[in-house]
Amino acid sequence: LVGSEMCIRDRGFEPDKMIEEYTVGDDRELDMRLAKYDVEGSLAHIAMLEKIGLLTSAELEELTAGLKEIAAEIEAGRFAIEPDTEDVHSQVELMLTRRLGDAGKKIHSGRSRNDQVLVDLKLFLRDELRQTADAVKTLFDRLQGLSEQYKEVLMPGYTHLQIAMPSSFGLWFGAYAETLVDDMRLVAAAWHIANQNPLGSAAGYLSLIHIS
């Protein structure tokens, strides 16, 4: 198995280099951000494959160790998508197949590239949204603290660019804190939407394998 065999868009003719560069030029760079999530999704997928009998316990153990080894390489910055390899999904499968033989090819059983990509993106979004929620909560707590700290410090309240009534710096900080409450609800809602597993949709019309 060589890298060029993992290129899905290879249809037996040489593509126009300018068109290829325009359409997929940044794909590998962007895919690198999904690498650890691809491994994470594959670890869950092979556990399911063993559960329904498509993998033996020995194969599951072997593949799990292989995927965790790749995850360590990603974390250490030693993982790269080879020039002739389509994307991160193909690269992970290629590395497993080189190291483990035919067992490496089995990780694609019961899933399509379509739902595999969606899994990676949802895991990525879920992680990013969690970090965003943590950052917003930190800012909210800080503003709430400043609101309490400066609640007795007066400042003018304006309306239509004119001084309207007495206010305080505490109320000013608190107002900004309150605006973040809705933001945190929106982030939480987005996280719940991202936290849905698309595996099983395969290429778009379900999998013929009765996956769990």
Residue ranges and their predicted role:
Residues S4, R9-L206, S212:
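A helix-coil-helix interface module used to build multimeric assemblies
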